[in-house]
């Protein structure tokens, strides 16, 4: 596999010389299944790099195939993870594309253990390894004649890219490389492969899903940087919110029709790819709109308690609509996640599904306070029960989220007690029926918001992020599993 060498170096000149003399090219990589079969037949032929890759794969396989783990038991796959990590320390001194593949798997596994900061660092390390190798740049057919090998380079790069963008968005951290520095083609189908070549065809399947995941991960990172970072912006907050919604709408409309329909409706029996894209899309919409929802809650509560500052602008129709859209997205994701919990397809140790469930639970809790909607309150309680069950099954992520859920539940009890004394809620209420009958991801509510030339969120400009939200610093003595 080619490694990027600076053309000005003596090593590059020597390499050019050997290429001219030998004129040799490389062939496509061996598939992982072949590597596993070879290791089973003859373990002596399995070198350190191959063993490390297999151990990383075994760790992921055990984590995602296990349904429950008791407190006295080791986390599923931890033995393989430790072995792979130790081997990788030796292998990392020499850049290889196999090392990037191993890092990608170890990053996903670290996240499953709720070591999300380690996962973020490993994903960033994988992306920097890609840059050292030169995977962020296209390789011409003259440099690498094997088309399958070129496609493999492309897919390894974008796999690391997705993790870097996704983890950065999840943690609110910077990305590792700017898009302007990337010159790589999107994944493509290798139509020239014969149908009998099932091994290579399987390697390069799901191109539409892969490309959609790349673009959505990029949008998620952009939304986080645009709305939640403390960098200086030349555009008002309302314009950045509207741009985020428009970008998400364009992403959805740009999907191939079969994939778009599957993601919009998520019919029974949908693939894991479609369900995950559906949930990720909803999460991006929630990210773009929940600052408005939280600020609407703050103004409503101040108004009901008579503590609203003089001169505060009234809440605009755009803000109300965005708040309703946020709740609508949460309800939609809740239905998908609760159904997956019922039918047994909810992966116990997958961090992202657990995080999505926690995210929508908080939005439903806010909706129950704003709208006095008993349905959203009941759904919040059900989501809390699912998280508690995941915690009992050994999910470290659910264990941490349950602490926040319990604190939220106690707060809701206090709010309801105050309402009984006062005799009213935070009027005017949000539309508590919105979203229950809507099937499309971008329904009439969001379409109306997207059609507006400018959202009226001026009441939020002075208090958005920089002034209204203080920076959080968690105590260092927290349990490592709950960071």
Question: Residue spans of the language-model regions?
Answer:
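Extended, leucine-rich alpha-helical cores of fungal transcription factors
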Residues: 35-56, 62-181, 201-254, 264-382
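Compositionally biased, low-complexity linear motifs
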Residues: 30-41, 185-192
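Substrate-access "cap/lid" subdomains that shape
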Residues: 259
């Amino acid at each position: 596999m080619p490694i990027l060498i600076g053309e000005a170096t003596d090593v590059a000149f020597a390499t050019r010389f050997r290429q001219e003399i030998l004129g040799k090219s490389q062939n496509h990589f061996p598939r992982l299944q072949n590597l596993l079969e070879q290791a089973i037949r003859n373990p002596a032929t399995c070198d350190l790099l191959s063993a490390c890759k297999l151990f990383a794969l075994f760790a992921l396989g055990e984590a995602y195939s296990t349904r429950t783990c008791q407190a006295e038991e080791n986390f599923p796959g931890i033995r393989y993870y430790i072995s792979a990590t130790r081997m990788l320390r030796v292998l990392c001194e020499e850049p290889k594309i196999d090392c990037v593949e191993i890092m990608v798997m170890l990053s996903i596994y670290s996240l499953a253990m709720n070591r999300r900061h380690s996962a973020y660092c490993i994903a960033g390390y994988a992306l920097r390894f890609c840059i050292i190798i030169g995977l962020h740049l296209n390789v011409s057919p003259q440099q690498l004649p094997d088309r399958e090998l070129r496609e493999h380079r492309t897919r390894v790069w974008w796999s690391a890219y997705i993790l870097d963008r996704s983890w950065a968005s999840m943690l609110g951290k910077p990305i590792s490389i700017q898009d302007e520095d990337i010159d790589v083609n999107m994944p493509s189908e290798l139509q020239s492969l014969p149908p009998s070549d099932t091994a290579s065809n399987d390697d390069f399947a799901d191109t539409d899903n892969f490309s959609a995941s790349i673009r959505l991960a990029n949008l998620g990172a952009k939304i986080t940087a645009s709305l939640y970072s403390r960098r200086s912006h030349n555009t008002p907050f309302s314009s950045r919110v509207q741009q985020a919604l428009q970008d998400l709408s364009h992403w959805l409309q740009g999907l191939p029709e079969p994939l778009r329909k599957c993601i919009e409706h998520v019919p029974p029996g949908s693939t894991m790819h479609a369900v995950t894209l559906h949930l990720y899309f909803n999460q991006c919409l929630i990210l773009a709109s929940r600052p408005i929802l939280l600020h609407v809650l703050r103004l409503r509560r101040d108004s009901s308690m008579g503590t609203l500052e003089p001169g505060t602008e009234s809440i605009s129709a755009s803000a109300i609509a965005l708040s309703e859209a946020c709740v609508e997205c949460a309800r939609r994701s809740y239905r998908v996640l609760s159904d997956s919990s019922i039918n047994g397809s909810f992966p116990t140790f997958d961090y992202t599904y657990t995080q999505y469930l926690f995210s929508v639970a908080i939005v439903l809790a806010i909706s129950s306070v704003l709208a006095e909607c008993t349905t959203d309150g009941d759904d919040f309680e059900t989501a809390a029960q699912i998280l508690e069950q995941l915690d009992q099954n050994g999910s470290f992520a659910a264990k941490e989220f349950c602490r926040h859920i319990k604190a939220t539940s106690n707060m809701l009890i206090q709010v309801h007690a105050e309402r009984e004394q006062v005799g009213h809620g935070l009027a005017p209420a949000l539309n508590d029926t919105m979203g229950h009958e809507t099937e499309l991801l971008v329904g009439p509510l969001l379409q109306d918001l997207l059609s507006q030339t400018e959202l009226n969120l001026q009441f939020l400009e002075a208090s958005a992020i920089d002034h209204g939200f203080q920076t959080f610093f968690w105590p260092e003595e927290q349990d490592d599993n709950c960071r």
